[in-house]
């Protein structure tokens, strides 16, 4: 049972998440803000954290760039959901790969644990993130040699479609890859709900 909630701006679609996930009071969430660690703008991490807390969920923060493998393994195993924040997708993949977390997350998702991905956390669910180079800087991930990502879905999320300040970047991705990759653009008020192999787009496009 594979269950994913993929969004551009999690706080803006939190109601859609609750419709999808149900009551999250007392649910424990492995909260991974790693992608934001190399970004100057990171308000979205606090917004997501606060949204969970206001519904009575427990946040168990996990920064892959500093955590040990034992800590990573323990937190992913004991908590009920996995949330991966926005930020730099290449830095996120570098740390997922370096720590071995990518394989652990794949195993937990295949076993039925819910995955929640916001922006970079949504794009990392694709088979490969080479297409993200028009939105994120590779300079933040000097150790990254392979763009193979989590491969949780068979499509490629393009977040923030028509939303400032990513209008040009999102359109460049679409112009470049629309004929070669199964892209799925979503704006800040839309989300992709995945149940096994079924994909549903929720929310109204407001571009």
Curated annotation (Swiss-Prot):
Key word Protease present: yes
GO function terms (MF aspect): serine-type peptidase activity
A Pfam family the protein falls into: Peptidase_S51
Active site: 119, 160
SUPFAM superfamilies (UniProt xref): Class I glutamine amidotransferase-like (SSF52317)
Annotated GO biological process: proteolysis
Top-tier EC class: hydrolase
Family in the record: Belongs to the peptidase S51 family.
PANTHER family cross-referenced by the UniProt entry: ALPHA-ASPARTYL DIPEPTIDASE, PROTEASE S51 ALPHA-ASPARTYL DIPEPTIDASE
Name assigned to this protein: Uncharacterized peptidase PM1590
Phylogenetic lineage: Bacteria, Pseudomonadati, Pseudomonadota, Gammaproteobacteria, Pasteurellales
């Amino acid at each position: 049972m594979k269950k994913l909630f993929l969004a551009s701006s999690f706080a803006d679609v939190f109601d859609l998440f609750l419709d999808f996930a149900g009551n999250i009071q007392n649910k424990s969430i492995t909260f991974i803000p790693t992608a934001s660690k190399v970004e100057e703008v990171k308000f979205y991490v606090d917004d997501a954290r606060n949204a969970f807390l206001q519904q009575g969920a427990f946040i168990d923060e996990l920064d892959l760039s500093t955590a040990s493998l034992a800590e990573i393994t323990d937190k992913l195993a004991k908590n009920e959901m996995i949330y991966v924040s926005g930020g730099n997708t290449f830095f996120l993949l570098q740390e997922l790969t370096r720590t071995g977390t990518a394989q652990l997350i794949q195993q937990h998702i295949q076993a039925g644990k819910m995955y929640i991905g916001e922006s970079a956390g949504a794009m990392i669910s694709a088979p490969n993130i080479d297409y993200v180079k028009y939105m994120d800087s590779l300079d933040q991930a000097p150790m990254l040699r392979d763009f193979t990502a989590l491969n949780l879905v068979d499509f490629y999320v393009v977040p923030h479609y028509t939303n400032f300040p990513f209008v040009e970047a999102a359109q460049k991705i679409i112009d470049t890859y629309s004929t070669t990759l199964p892209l799925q653009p979503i704006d800040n008020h839309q989300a992709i709900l995945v149940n096994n192999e079924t994909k549903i787009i929720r929310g109204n496009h407001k571009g």
